[in-house]
Amino acid sequence: MEKKVLVTGASGFIGSFLVEGGLERGMLTWAGIRKTSSRKYLQDKRIRFAELNFGDKEKLKEQLTGHKQEHGGWDYIIHCAGVTKCLHQEDFDKGNYQATVNFVEALKELEMVPERFMYISSLSIFGPIHEESYEPISEKDEAKPNTAYGVSKLKSEK
């Protein structure tokens, strides 16, 4: 039986490559996108699409329920969706942290928790670490984000 994977943020740079990776591995691959997302880099006919609204938990639950009824759940979810540019700092929190909370809570409430859930964060969580020494960042380094984006991504990891 083929494994099923959902890549959220699939219209983005990293997400589009992860969709390709799922297809190359023979997985049934869903591209999780917003209704308004570009499909420019998602042209392969094998890609299945899931329109997801992370900003509205009830709408998201409706969308996930529809998917569950038609296809079941996913074996793997790679969560890349998020915002990188906002007019107001608090919008980073809504678009990254609250959206991730909505997604995880909806999956739990609908009993759609996958075998594996991977959250894609950002180097921005570390802030200006090792700027002068150019040493590699390690898991032991302390995260000290200095942007609203970095703070929202770090908060989403927890």
Regions found by a protein language model. Name each.
Residues 5-25:
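N-terminal Rossmann NAD(P)H-binding glycine-rich loop of SDR-like oxidoreductase domains
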Residues 28-30:
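Short beta-strand element of Class I
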Residues 32-37, 53-54:
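N-terminal Rossmann-fold cofactor-binding loop
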Residues 38-45:
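Short loop/helix-cap segments at secondary-structure boundaries that form the rim of catalytic
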